[in-house]
């Protein structure tokens, strides 16, 4: 019997970290910050930008907006696949590129719903029926059954019956246009006429969107929500935030487009693009939200997941620990996850993997598998994020609080300027943060004081300390801003009060 069954689960609860790969996400979804604000009011839709780190819940939020589409009466159109020709580069990506992709998806979603009401299109007058036929020829003309299925996978907000309908009625290599023309009794348009009409269409993309919105409203929807996600995951953007923003810039900076009546453009974006986006941003016109999960919220995420995968039998990791947990394991996992729902799953998966290696027949998690799994995760995420050399430097420093002079004189034995440059690099990657200044007897002026703020790296610095002692000695929640500080206050020089890394207020 698999370990997950021994532990009381019906399936592996930590096998997937990508929200798009979790078919039952709604069963254990915990609304992230600003969930209601991002959905907004479909009767008066508006554009919004959601910024979050990778693994911060952007795609889960998008999925749940899709899930609520019928309840709120809007048509969800996901746009998370960006295809490029062989010679195309980011400089070639224009507003027209995006609008053509968006119109294709809206049209397919509209026609899918029409499959339930084919008489609606037959009742339209001849000019409107020809207009729809032209849309079909222009935007879906090259679709065959295989390409159609790829596009339908992207439109995750469509009820599954529509995907099943098209799969059953369009052959793998069959022309989708022919099926549509026959099903809806639409006019066939000759190739020369199509080319001439296409030329006219390309000059009126926004008018086309307004026209499609009118058709969609005839189906009973209040608005169209365009949900743009994953622009940082293409072959042309990768890990480059500047390239990522360049891809979406023609779309996100067009305020006329984003303000189109009947449309709600929702952007789910990697937060590393923010410095570049800020140059164009108009927060007075486009609402902007940052997803920042508290530890308590992550504990709810973890608990709901455990319950969903166990039929309600398992509610916490601590309950799975053999001989009782000497500390709150769920809180520790969510503390070290650094505000990331995905990291919560990654830590739990590491614990599960270590336990399976130790004893796959166990019905409880051993304390050693929990501690080792957490350390394995910390090593992996720290190395992936900052590189092996930086991790070695942090462990060489041996503490999370320091001044430039301390590192220069007591640790690395180099000039202060060399350390200053190194610290600037750590600050740029959000590994280290300045937490005010301190006074010391050896300096006439206050010295900048720095703290390692990535909890995974702090755990590696103190890896020889038992987890329960690590939490007892270093974990200092701030009563003002709820920041979970991990610091040994003994490292604050005499006469200097320990302060919070988040708000800078005194911790005592």
Residue ranges and their predicted role:
Residues 204-326:
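The catalytic "switch" region of P-loop NTPases
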Residues 94-116, 129-131, 222, 327-361, ...:
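P-loop NTPase catalytic cores that bind/hydrolyze ATP
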Residues 413-429, 433-436, 491:
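Short amphipathic alpha-helical interaction segments
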Residues 53-222, 474-480, 484, 496, ...:
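P-loop NTPase nucleotide-binding core
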Residues 1-96:
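Walker A/P-loop-proximal flanking segment of P-loop NTPase domains
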Residues 2-9, 126-135, 292-346, 351-355:
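Amphipathic alpha-helical segments of the small helical/lid subdomains adjacent to P-loop NTPase cores
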Residues 446-484:
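Short, amphipathic alpha-helical interaction segments positioned at domain boundaries
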Residues 331-420:
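Winged-helix-like regulatory helical subdomains adjacent to P-loop NTPase cores
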């Amino acid at each position: 019997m698999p370990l997950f069954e021994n532990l009381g689960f019906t399936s592996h609860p930590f096998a997937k970290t990508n929200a798009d790969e979790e078919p039952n996400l709604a069963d254990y979804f915990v609304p992230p910050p600003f969930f209601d604000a991002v959905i907004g009011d479909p009767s008066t839709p508006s554009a919004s930008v959601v910024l979050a780190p990778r693994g911060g819940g952007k795609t889960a939020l998008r999925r749940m907006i899709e899930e609520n589409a019928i309840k709120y009466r809007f048509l969800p159109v996901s746009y998370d696949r960006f295809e490029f020709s062989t010679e195309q580069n980011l400089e070639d990506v224009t507003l027209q590129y995006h609008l053509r992709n968006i119109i294709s998806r809206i049209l397919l979603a509209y026609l899918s719903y029409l499959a339930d009401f084919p008489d609606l299109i037959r009742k339209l007058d001849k000019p409107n029926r020809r207009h729809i036929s032209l849309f079909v020829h222009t935007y879906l003309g090259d679709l065959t059954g295989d390409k159609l299925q790829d596009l339908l996978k992207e439109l995750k907000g469509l009820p599954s019956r529509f995907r099943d309908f098209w799969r059953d009625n369009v052959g793998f290599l069959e022309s989708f246009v022919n099926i549509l023309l026959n099903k809806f009794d639409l006019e066939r348009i000759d190739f020369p006429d199509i080319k001439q009409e296409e030329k006219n269409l390309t000059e009126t993309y926004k008018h086309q969107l307004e026209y499609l919105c009118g058709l969609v409203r005839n189906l009973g929807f209040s608005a169209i929500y365009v949900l743009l996600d994953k622009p940082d995951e293409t072959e042309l953007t990768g890990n480059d935030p500047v390239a990522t923003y360049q891809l979406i810039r023609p779309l996100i900076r067009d305020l006329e487009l984003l303000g189109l009546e009947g449309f709600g453009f929702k952007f789910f974006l990697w937060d590393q693009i923010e410095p570049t986006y800020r140059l164009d941003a108009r927060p007075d016109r486009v609402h902007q939200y940052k997803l920042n999960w508290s530890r308590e919220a992550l504990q709810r995420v973890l608990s709901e997941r455990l319950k969903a995968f166990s039929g309600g039998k398992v509610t916490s990791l601590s309950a799975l620990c053999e001989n009782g947990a000497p500390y709150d394991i769920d809180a520790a996992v969510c503390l070290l996850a650094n505000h990331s729902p995905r990291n919560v799953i990654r830590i739990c998966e590491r614990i599960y993997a270590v336990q399976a290696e130790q004893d796959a027949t166990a019905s409880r998690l051993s304390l050693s598998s929990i501690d080792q799994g957490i350390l394995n995760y910390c090593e992996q995420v720290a190395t992936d994020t900052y590189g092996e050399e930086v991790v070695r430097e942090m462990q060489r420093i041996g503490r999370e609080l320091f001044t430039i002079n301390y590192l220069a004189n007591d640790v690395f034995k180099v000039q202060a300027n060399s350390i200053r440059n190194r610290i600037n690099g750590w600050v740029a990657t959000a590994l280290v943060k300045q937490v005010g200044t301190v006074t010391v007897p050896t300096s006439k002026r206050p010295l900048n004081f720095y703290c390692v703020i990535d909890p995974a790296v702090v755990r590696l610095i103190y890896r020889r300390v038992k987890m329960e002692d690590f939490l007892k000695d270093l974990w200092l929640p701030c009563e003002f801003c709820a920041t979970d500080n991990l610091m040994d206050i003994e490292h604050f020089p005499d006469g200097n009060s320990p302060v919070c890394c988040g708000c800078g207020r005194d911790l005592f």
